[in-house]
Amino acid sequence: MKNVLSAIQPTGDLHIGNYFGAVQNWVRLQESYNCVYGVVDYHTMTMPYKASDLLENTWKMTFQLLACGVKPENIFIQSLVPEHAELAWILSCVTSYGELTRMTQFKDKSKQLEDNDGKEAFVGAGLLFYPVLQAADILIYHADYVPVGKDQEQHLELSRSIAQRFNFQFGKEYFRHPEPLYTETPKILSPADPTRKMSKSLGEKHYINLLGDEDRTRKQIKSAVTDTGDTPAGQMSAGVLNLFEILRACNQMDAYDSLMADYHAGALKYSALKESVADALVELINPMRENYQALLADKRRVRDSIKDSSAVIRQRAQQTLREVRELSGLPAVK
Protein backbone atom coordinates (compact mmCIF):
# COMPACT_ATOMS: atom_id res chain seq x y z
CA MET A 1 0.00 0.00 0.00
CA LYS A 2 1.37 3.42 -0.99
CA ASN A 3 2.21 6.06 1.63
CA VAL A 4 0.33 9.38 1.85
CA LEU A 5 1.39 12.34 3.99
CA SER A 6 -0.61 15.49 4.57
CA ALA A 7 -0.68 18.10 7.30
CA ILE A 8 -2.60 21.06 8.64
CA GLN A 9 -1.61 24.00 10.82
CA PRO A 10 -3.48 24.38 14.12
CA THR A 11 -4.73 27.92 13.62
CA GLY A 12 -8.09 27.45 15.35
CA ASP A 13 -11.39 25.90 14.36
CA LEU A 14 -11.81 24.09 11.06
CA HIS A 15 -14.06 25.89 8.61
CA ILE A 16 -16.08 24.33 5.82
CA GLY A 17 -13.43 25.32 3.27
CA ASN A 18 -10.87 23.24 5.19
CA TYR A 19 -13.26 20.32 5.33
CA PHE A 20 -14.32 20.23 1.69
CA GLY A 21 -10.86 21.20 0.44
CA ALA A 22 -8.78 18.76 2.49
CA VAL A 23 -10.15 16.93 5.52
CA GLN A 24 -13.01 15.16 3.74
CA ASN A 25 -10.44 13.85 1.28
CA TRP A 26 -8.16 12.72 4.14
CA VAL A 27 -10.97 10.56 5.51
CA ARG A 28 -11.56 8.93 2.12
CA LEU A 29 -7.87 8.29 1.43
CA GLN A 30 -7.54 6.21 4.61
CA GLU A 31 -9.35 3.35 2.87
CA SER A 32 -6.85 3.04 0.02
CA TYR A 33 -3.50 4.30 1.35
CA ASN A 34 -1.19 4.09 4.34
CA CYS A 35 -1.92 7.61 5.62
CA VAL A 36 -0.08 9.81 8.08
CA TYR A 37 -1.63 13.16 8.97
CA GLY A 38 0.21 15.81 10.94
CA VAL A 39 -1.01 18.66 13.11
CA VAL A 40 2.02 20.81 12.39
CA ASP A 41 2.49 23.14 15.33
CA TYR A 42 6.14 23.91 14.48
CA HIS A 43 4.93 25.51 11.24
CA THR A 44 2.50 27.76 13.11
CA MET A 45 5.44 29.28 14.99
CA THR A 46 6.71 30.93 11.79
CA MET A 47 4.12 33.71 12.17
CA PRO A 48 3.33 35.79 15.29
CA TYR A 49 1.41 33.73 17.86
CA LYS A 50 0.64 33.30 21.57
CA ALA A 51 2.00 30.20 23.29
CA SER A 52 -1.23 29.50 25.16
CA ASP A 53 -3.23 29.80 21.93
CA LEU A 54 -0.91 27.44 20.08
CA LEU A 55 -1.28 24.66 22.64
CA GLU A 56 -5.05 25.08 22.83
CA ASN A 57 -5.44 25.20 19.05
CA THR A 58 -3.23 22.15 18.56
CA TRP A 59 -5.53 20.01 20.66
CA LYS A 60 -8.65 21.65 19.24
CA MET A 61 -7.56 20.87 15.69
CA THR A 62 -6.70 17.30 16.66
CA PHE A 63 -10.09 16.70 18.26
CA GLN A 64 -11.88 18.21 15.27
CA LEU A 65 -10.00 15.99 12.82
CA LEU A 66 -11.06 12.98 14.86
CA ALA A 67 -14.66 14.19 14.86
CA CYS A 68 -14.56 14.36 11.06
CA GLY A 69 -13.50 10.73 10.79
CA VAL A 70 -9.70 10.80 10.68
CA LYS A 71 -8.48 7.67 12.45
CA PRO A 72 -6.51 8.33 15.66
CA GLU A 73 -3.74 5.93 14.66
CA ASN A 74 -3.06 8.08 11.57
CA ILE A 75 -2.60 11.37 13.45
CA PHE A 76 0.57 12.80 14.96
CA ILE A 77 1.40 16.14 16.51
CA GLN A 78 4.54 17.47 14.85
CA SER A 79 6.32 18.71 17.98
CA LEU A 80 5.91 15.25 19.55
CA VAL A 81 8.14 13.93 16.75
CA PRO A 82 11.23 16.17 17.10
CA GLU A 83 13.04 14.21 14.39
CA HIS A 84 11.23 16.47 11.91
CA ALA A 85 13.30 19.42 13.12
CA GLU A 86 16.58 17.48 12.98
CA LEU A 87 15.91 16.27 9.46
CA ALA A 88 14.95 19.80 8.42
CA TRP A 89 18.40 21.01 9.52
CA ILE A 90 20.17 18.29 7.54
CA LEU A 91 18.03 18.98 4.48
CA SER A 92 18.63 22.73 4.78
CA CYS A 93 22.28 22.00 4.06
CA VAL A 94 21.34 20.68 0.61
CA THR A 95 18.91 23.54 -0.08
CA SER A 96 20.00 26.83 -1.62
CA TYR A 97 19.18 30.21 -0.16
CA GLY A 98 18.00 31.34 -3.59
CA GLU A 99 15.42 28.56 -3.78
CA LEU A 100 13.91 29.62 -0.48
CA THR A 101 13.73 33.33 -1.29
CA ARG A 102 11.87 32.49 -4.51
CA MET A 103 9.07 30.70 -2.68
CA THR A 104 5.79 32.51 -3.32
CA GLN A 105 4.48 31.83 0.18
CA PHE A 106 7.57 33.41 1.76
CA LYS A 107 7.08 36.53 -0.34
CA ASP A 108 3.36 36.70 0.43
CA LYS A 109 3.70 36.21 4.17
CA SER A 110 6.65 38.59 4.42
CA LYS A 111 4.54 41.21 2.68
CA GLN A 112 1.65 40.47 5.05
CA LEU A 113 3.92 41.17 8.03
CA GLU A 114 5.21 44.36 6.42
CA ASP A 115 1.67 45.52 5.63
CA ASN A 116 0.76 45.04 9.29
CA ASP A 117 3.91 46.40 10.93
CA GLY A 118 5.65 48.52 8.32
CA LYS A 119 8.95 48.11 6.50
CA GLU A 120 10.77 47.38 9.77
CA ALA A 121 8.56 44.34 10.44
CA PHE A 122 10.31 41.34 11.95
CA VAL A 123 10.38 38.46 9.46
CA GLY A 124 11.70 35.37 11.23
CA ALA A 125 14.15 32.98 9.59
CA GLY A 126 11.66 30.21 10.35
CA LEU A 127 9.37 31.65 7.68
CA LEU A 128 12.18 31.38 5.13
CA PHE A 129 12.97 27.79 6.17
CA TYR A 130 9.30 26.75 6.32
CA PRO A 131 9.51 24.79 3.02
CA VAL A 132 12.52 22.81 4.28
CA LEU A 133 10.60 21.70 7.37
CA GLN A 134 7.72 20.85 5.06
CA ALA A 135 10.09 18.73 2.97
CA ALA A 136 11.23 16.97 6.15
CA ASP A 137 7.58 16.30 7.08
CA ILE A 138 7.10 14.55 3.75
CA LEU A 139 10.40 12.76 3.29
CA ILE A 140 10.76 11.44 6.83
CA TYR A 141 7.86 9.02 6.20
CA HIS A 142 8.94 8.18 2.63
CA ALA A 143 5.64 9.47 1.28
CA ASP A 144 4.71 8.38 -2.23
CA TYR A 145 1.92 10.91 -2.55
CA VAL A 146 1.00 14.26 -1.06
CA PRO A 147 -2.52 15.66 -1.54
CA VAL A 148 -1.89 19.24 -2.63
CA GLY A 149 -3.71 22.30 -3.82
CA LYS A 150 -2.35 24.71 -6.38
CA ASP A 151 -0.90 26.92 -3.62
CA GLN A 152 1.37 24.12 -2.39
CA GLU A 153 2.68 22.77 -5.72
CA GLN A 154 5.81 24.91 -5.52
CA HIS A 155 6.69 23.56 -2.06
CA LEU A 156 6.20 19.95 -3.17
CA GLU A 157 8.43 20.53 -6.18
CA LEU A 158 11.09 21.88 -3.81
CA SER A 159 10.72 18.75 -1.65
CA ARG A 160 11.37 16.62 -4.72
CA SER A 161 14.44 18.70 -5.59
CA ILE A 162 15.78 18.41 -2.05
CA ALA A 163 15.29 14.62 -2.09
CA GLN A 164 17.07 14.36 -5.42
CA ARG A 165 19.97 16.53 -4.25
CA PHE A 166 20.37 14.58 -0.99
CA ASN A 167 20.38 11.28 -2.87
CA PHE A 168 22.98 12.55 -5.33
CA GLN A 169 25.24 14.11 -2.69
CA PHE A 170 25.34 10.98 -0.53
CA GLY A 171 25.41 8.45 -3.34
CA LYS A 172 22.24 6.51 -2.67
CA GLU A 173 18.68 6.66 -4.01
CA TYR A 174 17.37 6.91 -0.45
CA PHE A 175 14.50 9.38 -0.42
CA ARG A 176 11.50 8.84 -2.68
CA HIS A 177 10.38 11.63 -4.97
CA PRO A 178 6.85 12.33 -3.72
CA GLU A 179 4.16 12.85 -6.32
CA PRO A 180 1.20 15.22 -6.01
CA LEU A 181 -2.12 13.47 -5.42
CA TYR A 182 -4.81 15.46 -7.16
CA THR A 183 -8.39 14.83 -6.17
CA GLU A 184 -11.52 16.74 -7.05
CA THR A 185 -12.06 19.24 -4.28
CA PRO A 186 -14.44 22.21 -4.40
CA LYS A 187 -13.08 25.71 -3.92
CA ILE A 188 -15.28 27.27 -1.26
CA LEU A 189 -15.27 31.07 -1.19
CA SER A 190 -16.08 33.66 1.45
CA PRO A 191 -19.84 34.08 2.03
CA ALA A 192 -19.25 37.80 2.61
CA ASP A 193 -16.99 38.34 -0.42
CA PRO A 194 -17.27 35.49 -2.95
CA THR A 195 -14.41 36.89 -4.99
CA ARG A 196 -12.02 35.69 -2.25
CA LYS A 197 -11.18 32.27 -0.86
CA MET A 198 -12.76 31.39 2.49
CA SER A 199 -10.20 32.28 5.15
CA LYS A 200 -10.11 33.03 8.86
CA SER A 201 -7.51 35.72 8.27
CA LEU A 202 -10.15 37.87 6.53
CA GLY A 203 -12.38 38.05 9.61
CA GLU A 204 -15.39 36.27 11.11
CA LYS A 205 -17.80 37.15 8.30
CA HIS A 206 -15.60 35.40 5.76
CA TYR A 207 -15.65 31.82 7.04
CA ILE A 208 -18.17 29.30 8.38
CA ASN A 209 -16.99 27.19 11.30
CA LEU A 210 -17.35 23.51 10.50
CA LEU A 211 -18.47 22.55 13.99
CA GLY A 212 -19.93 25.88 14.99
CA ASP A 213 -23.37 26.78 16.25
CA GLU A 214 -26.24 25.75 13.93
CA ASP A 215 -28.02 29.09 14.26
CA ARG A 216 -24.86 30.97 13.29
CA THR A 217 -24.35 28.69 10.28
CA ARG A 218 -27.89 29.36 9.08
CA LYS A 219 -27.50 33.09 9.68
CA GLN A 220 -24.26 33.24 7.67
CA ILE A 221 -25.80 31.40 4.73
CA LYS A 222 -28.91 33.60 4.89
CA SER A 223 -26.76 36.73 4.72
CA ALA A 224 -24.36 35.36 2.07
CA VAL A 225 -23.69 37.76 -0.80
CA THR A 226 -25.38 36.69 -4.03
CA ASP A 227 -25.07 39.74 -6.27
CA THR A 228 -21.47 40.90 -6.71
CA GLY A 229 -22.55 43.64 -9.12
CA ASP A 230 -19.94 43.00 -11.82
CA THR A 231 -21.12 39.71 -13.34
CA PRO A 232 -21.08 39.62 -17.17
CA ALA A 233 -24.49 39.15 -18.77
CA GLY A 234 -25.56 35.52 -18.97
CA GLN A 235 -23.10 34.33 -16.31
CA MET A 236 -23.87 33.15 -12.79
CA SER A 237 -22.63 35.54 -10.12
CA ALA A 238 -19.74 34.39 -7.92
CA GLY A 239 -21.96 34.43 -4.83
CA VAL A 240 -24.67 32.23 -6.34
CA LEU A 241 -22.06 29.89 -7.80
CA ASN A 242 -20.45 29.59 -4.36
CA LEU A 243 -23.77 28.54 -2.81
CA PHE A 244 -24.27 25.93 -5.52
CA GLU A 245 -20.72 24.66 -4.91
CA ILE A 246 -21.44 24.21 -1.21
CA LEU A 247 -24.67 22.36 -2.02
CA ARG A 248 -22.85 20.04 -4.41
CA ALA A 249 -20.02 19.50 -1.91
CA CYS A 250 -22.66 18.35 0.61
CA ASN A 251 -23.72 15.76 -1.99
CA GLN A 252 -27.27 17.08 -2.12
CA MET A 253 -27.59 16.46 -5.85
CA ASP A 254 -31.39 16.30 -6.05
CA ALA A 255 -31.68 19.78 -4.55
CA TYR A 256 -28.72 20.94 -6.66
CA ASP A 257 -30.28 19.75 -9.93
CA SER A 258 -33.72 21.15 -9.08
CA LEU A 259 -32.41 24.58 -8.09
CA MET A 260 -30.04 24.71 -11.05
CA ALA A 261 -33.01 24.02 -13.34
CA ASP A 262 -34.83 26.92 -11.68
CA TYR A 263 -31.80 29.12 -12.30
CA HIS A 264 -31.66 28.30 -16.00
CA ALA A 265 -35.42 28.87 -16.26
CA GLY A 266 -35.02 32.29 -14.65
CA ALA A 267 -37.16 31.20 -11.70
CA LEU A 268 -34.54 30.76 -8.97
CA LYS A 269 -35.35 32.32 -5.61
CA TYR A 270 -32.19 33.07 -3.66
CA SER A 271 -34.06 32.44 -0.41
CA ALA A 272 -34.85 28.87 -1.52
CA LEU A 273 -31.23 28.29 -2.55
CA LYS A 274 -29.92 29.59 0.76
CA GLU A 275 -32.39 27.50 2.75
CA SER A 276 -31.33 24.34 0.89
CA VAL A 277 -27.64 25.12 1.43
CA ALA A 278 -28.16 25.76 5.15
CA ASP A 279 -30.18 22.53 5.53
CA ALA A 280 -27.49 20.57 3.67
CA LEU A 281 -24.70 21.93 5.86
CA VAL A 282 -26.59 21.25 9.08
CA GLU A 283 -27.37 17.69 7.97
CA LEU A 284 -23.71 17.09 7.13
CA ILE A 285 -22.29 18.77 10.21
CA ASN A 286 -24.59 17.51 12.98
CA PRO A 287 -23.06 13.99 13.24
CA MET A 288 -19.55 15.48 13.34
CA ARG A 289 -20.63 18.00 15.97
CA GLU A 290 -21.99 15.14 18.10
CA ASN A 291 -18.71 13.24 17.65
CA TYR A 292 -16.80 16.33 18.73
CA GLN A 293 -18.83 16.77 21.91
CA ALA A 294 -18.33 13.09 22.79
CA LEU A 295 -14.57 13.45 22.32
CA LEU A 296 -14.47 16.58 24.49
CA ALA A 297 -16.29 14.65 27.23
CA ASP A 298 -13.38 12.19 27.30
CA LYS A 299 -10.46 14.59 26.83
CA ARG A 300 -7.81 12.75 28.83
CA ARG A 301 -8.30 9.43 27.05
CA VAL A 302 -8.33 11.09 23.63
CA ARG A 303 -5.18 13.09 24.33
CA ASP A 304 -3.42 9.98 25.59
CA SER A 305 -4.41 8.09 22.44
CA ILE A 306 -2.94 10.83 20.23
CA LYS A 307 0.26 10.90 22.27
CA ASP A 308 0.42 7.13 21.79
CA SER A 309 -0.18 7.38 18.03
CA SER A 310 2.46 10.12 17.80
CA ALA A 311 4.92 7.84 19.64
CA VAL A 312 4.23 4.96 17.25
CA ILE A 313 4.57 7.20 14.19
CA ARG A 314 7.74 8.64 15.72
CA GLN A 315 9.37 5.22 15.52
CA ARG A 316 9.22 5.47 11.73
CA ALA A 317 10.80 8.93 11.88
CA GLN A 318 13.55 7.68 14.19
CA GLN A 319 14.41 4.87 11.77
CA THR A 320 14.70 7.39 8.94
CA LEU A 321 16.97 9.60 11.05
CA ARG A 322 19.23 6.67 11.93
CA GLU A 323 19.70 5.95 8.25
CA VAL A 324 20.07 9.62 7.28
CA ARG A 325 22.69 10.21 9.97
CA GLU A 326 24.70 7.25 8.72
CA LEU A 327 24.46 8.38 5.09
CA SER A 328 25.44 11.97 5.91
CA GLY A 329 28.41 11.10 8.14
CA LEU A 330 26.93 11.78 11.58
CA PRO A 331 27.56 9.46 14.55
CA ALA A 332 24.84 7.08 15.64
CA VAL A 333 22.78 8.16 18.65
CA LYS A 334 23.05 5.69 21.49
Residue ranges, per PLM feature:
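Short, histidine-centered active-site or binding-site loop motifs used for metal coordination
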Residues: 8-10, 41-43, 143-145, 202, ...
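Internal, conserved structured core segments that host functional sites
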Residues: 105-166, 170, 190
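Short helix-capping/linker segments at secondary-structure and domain boundaries
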Residues: 97-102, 140-147, 251-259, 289
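N-terminal Rossmann-like or analogous alpha/beta NTP/dinucleotide-binding catalytic cores
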Residues: 2-136, 293
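Short, conserved loop/turn and helix-capping segments at secondary-structure boundaries
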Residues: 20, 52-55, 153-157, 211, ...
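A short, charged/proline- and glycine-enriched loop
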Residues: 1-2, 300
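Conserved nucleotide- and phosphate/pyrophosphate-binding catalytic cores
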Residues: 16, 160-334
